[in-house]
Amino acid sequence: GYGIYLEENRGIKQMINFTVGPVQSCDAVRAIGAEDVPYFRTSEFSEVMLENERLVLKFSGATKDSRCVFITGSGTASMEAAIMNILTPEDRALVVNGGSFGDRFCKLCDIHNIPYDAIKLETGRQLRESDIEAVAKDKKYTAFIVNKHETSTGVHYDMALISDYCKRNNLLLIVDNISSFLCDDFNMSELGADV
């Protein structure tokens, strides 16, 4: 990875990590992560997971009838789960590709035979409605796929613009909010985000 080393602490060099995740954590967070997890076949585990679901839905601004699926895999595994379980080859998606994670969505659509058109953006450039219109033209789509925050470039896409476009065109809105969750505003209900 990319990083710099700071002074030694207790004989261990401290490094600041500049790679795209996993991210640095403070001692208090690492201590919580080191705690034992309840055995998964107990009611205690079920209670913890139900509380986690309640909190994720609350902090995502999801509708009351929403459910949260926890995936014991990478962010890419979650992206793939959304593509392969929500869309079919009968769908057609618009995918914002402004960096490595947008490109990953395109590759996942290829793997799962989901027809799509990519809105290819120059590195670091914000999405504009004219970009959407230039690709969409008179084509019919069923879904719009975007990384709220394209981690590889640092661009936060204009979710109000995307939401408005999806509402006007009756598109399913699939949003990767992995790197923005709890850091940036994201309200699924207000945006009409489906996944």
Spans of features found by a protein language model:
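Generic structural signal for beta-strand residues in well-ordered domains
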Residues: 10, 61-62, 86, 137
